[in-house]
């Protein structure tokens, strides 16, 4: 599922919601466009293993505030992303750890994520055109 949300001070488009991913990924090109100093990355040495079994070593990890949903039914949460320098059609991937912490229910059929908030059920709608 493809969506947009606020990450730090930036409205990040082309975010992939991946229930199968065990990590949150921010691709280096998006990281650079956010004008974050590379010195803010926390070193990490654990490789990521892709679908084909290929290994990718992250440049580091960074924790950024992510805002999803429409006020007042929104979540604002610090999310740790692994920054990876490789090409991909998306700017970032939101993985299972974040979705679980939001208690989110995803529906690929409806291109929607629902999550509980203090003020009722929040909703995120995916981009149908981009999903094709």
Model-inferred region functions:
Residues 11-12, 89:
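Conserved catalytic motifs of the protein kinase core domain
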Residues 15-17:
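Short hydrophobic beta-strand that contains or immediately precedes a catalytic carboxylate
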């Amino acid at each position: 599922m493809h969506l947009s949300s606020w990450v730090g001070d930036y409205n990040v488009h082309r975010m992939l919601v991946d229930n199968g991913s065990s990590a949150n990924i921010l691709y280096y090109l998006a990281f650079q466009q956010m004008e974050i100093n590379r010195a803010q990355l926390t070193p990490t040495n654990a490789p990521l293993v892709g679908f084909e079994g290929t290994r990718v070593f992250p440049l580091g990890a960074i924790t950024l505030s992510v805002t999803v949903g429409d006020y007042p039914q929104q979540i604002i949460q610090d999310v740790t992303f692994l920054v990876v320098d490789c090409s991909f059609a998306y700017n970032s991937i939101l993985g299972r750890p974040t979705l679980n912490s939001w208690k989110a229910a995803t529906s690929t059929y409806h291109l929607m994520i629902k999550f509980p908030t203090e003020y009722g059920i929040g909703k995120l709608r995916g981009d149908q055109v981009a999903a094709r």
